[in-house]
Structures are given as structure tokens and as C-alpha cells.
Amino acid sequence: MLTCIIKYHIDPTKKAAFEQYARNWGQAIPRCGADLIGYYAPHEGSSTLAYGIYNIPDLAAYEAYRARLAADPLGRENYEFAQSEKFLLREDRTFLKLVSTPHGAQK
């Protein structure tokens, strides 16, 4: 299992547009095959950093998921929304693998 973390630099004056973008992905991403953990908008501290986080089985599954997302009507609409509103200043993706187990008390 891989976790994809998307780090966004957003225009702080367009936070509401980013939040709409995140809500749209909240529908499209699970429908297209990824396990969405969530989208996170700035609250305190930096007003320009936001994140999207989801799990995917492997890179081959990621490629298939991206193709489905590009063909999804809401996915296409959301890509176009981001382009037209220009609230995303930068977007970086990294794939991480969980290498620890929970550290709390086990029941």
C-alpha cells in the first residue's frame, strides 16, 4: 500500500475555491478507485499550504486510477475549475510507504 500526499501551495485569497475543489475530489477520488483519507486546508500557521492524502495499492493501480479520474465527468470539471480559478500556485506529489505500526496500547 502506498500513501500519496499532495502538497499544494494555494492563493490565500482563494481558500474557498480550494475548499470547493477538495469537496469535488471527495466525491470523484473514491469513485475512481483510491482510498481518500482527506483534503486539508489552512487553518492556523501557514495560509498557503494545503494537502490531499489518499492510499492506493501500488504504482500500477495509481496509473489506472489517474486514467479513470481523467475520464470522470467531475474529475474533468475539477481540473478545469482549478485552471480557470488559478488558486493552485504549486502542486507536489510524493508516494510514501508505511514502515511502522501504531504505537498506542493494543487491545
What residue ranges belong to the model's regions?
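Short, structured motif recognition centered on aromatic/hydrophobic residues
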Residues: 2-7, 18, 28-29, 50-53
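An amphipathic, aromatic/His-enriched active-site/gating alpha helix that lines ligand/cofactor pockets
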Residues: 20-37, 55-94
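Short, low-order "capping/linker" segments at domain edges
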Residues: 91-107
